[in-house]
Each structure stands twice: as structure tokens, then as C-alpha cells.
Curated annotation (Swiss-Prot):
Amino acids binding L-tyrosine: 200, 204, 207, 222
The keyword ATP-binding is annotated on this UniProt entry: yes
Function (record text): Catalyzes the attachment of tyrosine to tRNA(Tyr) in a two-step reaction: tyrosine is first activated by ATP to form Tyr-AMP and then transferred to the acceptor end of tRNA(Tyr).
Domain of life per record: Eukaryota
UniProt-recorded name of the protein: Tyrosine--tRNA ligase 1, cytoplasmic
Coiled coil (residue ranges): none
Effect of a null allele: No visible phenotype under normal growth conditions.
EC class: ligase
Source organism per UniProt: Arabidopsis thaliana (Mouse-ear cress)
Length: 385
């Protein structure tokens, strides 16, 4: 077993050297690396996804050297899908594929079981994973350029590659370092964790190398384990580290909610919500007049509506300023902060835009027998934390 673990580490250290971003290359890039027009265009598309990128120079070098980098994303099948998992994922994945990336979406069924999602029932978790794929298809994800991989199937088929890697990552890290990563599961270091949940970060770190990912495209809440993967590269003397591209996390719709909660229906828009449900949730959403910071309605517009439509339209009577179409978030924020744009008018425009985006998904789940059956099962499941 020791020999096998050593072989895995050696393979990781030497693989893809032809496209590796060495420290020398990264330095020369910052000292005057010139991207071609095509590479610069691809870079701008990919970089637009991330609230944070570690490291930008490495990303530029990667795109210059590799026509089809592998981008890794993943999810725990854990109940109904909210709009950030649905629409934002479609926006980001389609940007990656348009920039030439191969996207691998890791359906983390074993991870959901480790984290006790759906009560740890793998059959239910499987149903949820299939339901997620139906939503993305209906919402317009470029599935021809996306590879969906079930963690249980991939790990079982390549166990001799996967488990030595997990063990080596575990061996090279102290328990406090692993505990700092439990945020990736929606847990905190002070929670009473099972042994399975302590294993989870080591496995997710291993996924990155197992899938041969060049780019980790996950939310800011997954940042710590992605950084762990880069630190592991230092441990094994691997030059080409995975690039971290972390997207923004949408807040819940109620005041003070940093994240959406599947246990609080008013905190999030779900992908198959009916028009009336969307309207009620937005009407009740926190949206203080003239306040931009911490305003979830404005966040929805910035991260969902504008990327989807390239504009945001407010419909008003002439006496209140008439209809107005915005092309930039800065203009929306300025009008809102000044009081020119009223919360009621902003919410009305947001409702209209959200319902336009969600209508094809609703139609799919009403007309497609398989999708309809999956949703019926999902709604009957009890969501577990």
C-alpha cells in the first residue's frame, strides 16, 4: 500500500508537465506575458465568473497553453434546487464552455450520504441528482460540453487511484487544518461531527486531482478546501496547481440571511416555483429604500438578471418616471440609492425577469413525464441538514 500511495503522488507531481504553470513561467507572465486576442477574450469570459481567482497569472498561462482546460464543479444532491444552484450554475457553466473549457460536474452522492443529506439514503440522493440534471437541461445548460459524473460510480471503478490519494492527503494534514474546511459541508468547527464528516474534506480535496482539474469553479464557501488542494501541491512538489475560481454566494431573501436555506421557503426562489410563489417571495423580501449594501433584491439583479438578459427593465407609470431599461448594475444602484428607483418598482421588474427565466423549467416539469415524477418524489422527501 505504501508503494501504491507513493506511485499516486509521483504521478500527480509529474502529470501534465507540458502545460504546467511553473513559478518561472508565472513570473515571466507578470513581467510582460502577452496574451493573444483569442486568449484574452477567453480569459475575460472565465475571469468574469469569479469573485476571487487564485491565481490570475496562472489562469492566463493555462488558457494560453491549453485549448480545453478541465473545469471541475460539484454538488451534493440534497433536496429542491434554489435559483443560485440553478440559474447561476447555468450562467457559469455556459461561460466556461464558451471559453473552450471541458466541464466535469461531480454528482457527489457518496458525499451527500457522508453528510447525512436525505437521511443518508442513497436511493433518494440518486433521485435528487437526476432531478438536478433535468433542471439544468430545461434551463439551457450546454450539456453537450458537460460531463456528469457520479462520485460513487467513478470512485468504485478507479478505487486503486482514488483511495491512496485520499489517504496521502489525510496523512499530510493535521486534524485542525481539516476541521477548518468543514464549512464546505455547511458545518462549523464547533459542531459535533461524525468521523465520516471529518473524512469528507480529504475526499473533496482528492476529487480535484482525481478528475485532473485545471480549474476549481465552486462557490466562495468551498474556498478553504480548494486552498488545501494547492497546499497539497506544495507538499508533493507539484508545479501545476489547480486554479481556484470562486463565484459569489447569493444571500437569502430575508434580512440578515447570508445564504439561502432550503428549510426556510421564504429565503430562496426554487427552480420550479410557480409564478405566484415567486411574486409572494419577492414581495416579502428584504429591500430597504435607498440601501444598496446587503440588499438581496439588488444581488439577484446583479448576479442573475443582468448576466442572463444583459439588461433590467422597470415598468412604471409616466407620473413616476415611466419605463426604464438599465444596462449596468452601477446605474441601477445609483438610481436606487438616490431614491429615483422605488423598492416596489424594482421588485416588480425583478419578479417579471425571474418568471421569464423560470418558465421553461416549469413547462418541462409539467410536460415531461420523467421530470414530473422526479419532482413529485423530491417534494415528498424530508430535507435533513
Amino acid at each position: 500500500m505504501a508503494d501504491q500511495s507513493s506511485e499516486i503522488v509521483n504521478a500527480l507531481s509529474s502529470e501534465m508537465e507540458a502545460v504546467s504553470v511553473s513559478s518561472t513561467q508565472a513570473s515571466s507572465s507578470s513581467d510582460g506575458f502577452q496574451m493573444s486576442e483569442e486568449v484574452e477574450k477567453r480569459y475575460k469570459i472565465v475571469r468574469s465568473i469569479g469573485e476571487e481567482c487564485i491565481q490570475e497569472e496562472e489562469l492566463k498561462n493555462l488558457l494560453a497553453k491549453k485549448a480545453a482546460p478541465i473545469c471541475y464543479d460539484g454538488f451534493e444532491p440534497s433536496g429542491r434546487m434554489h435559483i443560485a444552484q440553478g440559474v447561476m450554475k447555468v450562467i457559469n457553466v455556459n461561460k466556461m464552455t464558451s471559453a473552450g473549457c471541458r466541464v466535469k460536474i461531480w454528482i457527489a452522492d457518496w458525499f451527500a450520504q457522508l453528510n447525512n443529506k436525505m437521511g443518508g439514503d442513497l436511493k433518494k440522493i440518486r433521485v435528487v441528482g437526476e432531478y438536478f440534471q433535468e433542471i439544468w437541461k430545461a434551463a439551457g445548460m450546454d450539456n453537450d460540453k458537460v460531463e456528469f459524473l457520479w462520485s460513487s460510480e467513478e470512485i468504485n471503478s478507479k478505487a486503486d487511484k482514488y483511495w491512496p490519494l485520499v489517504m496521502d492527503i489525510a496523512r499530510k494534514n493535521k486534524l485542525p487544518r481539516i476541521l477548518r474546511c468543514v464549512q464546505i459541508m455547511g458545518r462549523s468547527e464547533t459542531d459535533e461531527l461524525s468521523a465520516a464528516q471529518i473524512l469528507y474534506p480529504c475526499m473533496q480535496c482528492a476529487d480535484i486531482f482525481f478528475l485532473e482539474a485545471d480549474i476549481c469553479q465552486l462557490g466562495m464557501d468551498q474556498r478553504k478546501v480548494n486552498v488545501l488542494a494547492r497546499e497539497y501541491c506544495d507538499d508533493i512538489k507539484r508545479k501545476n496547481k489547480p486554479i481556484i475560481l470562486s463565484h459569489h454566494m447569493l444571500p437569502g431573501l430575508q434580512q440578515g440571511q447570508e445564504k439561502m436555506s432550503k428549510s426556510d421557503p421564504l429565503s430562496a426562489i426554487f427552480m420550479e416555483d410557480e409564478e405566484a410563489e415567486v411574486n409572494v417571495k419577492i414581495k416579502k423580501a428584504y429591500c430597504p429604500p435607498k440601501v444598496v449594501k446587503g440588499n438581496p433584491c439588488l444581488e439577484y439583479i446583479k448576479y442573475i438578471i443582468l448576466p442572463w438578459f444583459d439588461e433590467f427593465t422597470v415598468e412604471r407609470n409616466e407620473e413616476y418616471g415611466g419605463n426604464k431599461t438599465y444596462k449596468s448594475f452601477e446605474d441601477i444602484a445609483a438610481d436606487y440609492e438616490s431614491g429615483e428607483l422605488h423598492p416596489g418598482d424594482l421588485k416588480k421588474g425583478l419578479m417579471n425577469a425571474l418568471n421569464k427565466i423560470l418558465q421553461p423549467v416549469r413547462d418541462h416539469f409539467k410536460t415531461d413525464a420523467r421530470a414530473k415524477n422526479l419532482l413529485k418524489q423530491i417534494k415528498a422527501y424530508r430535507v435533513t441538514r
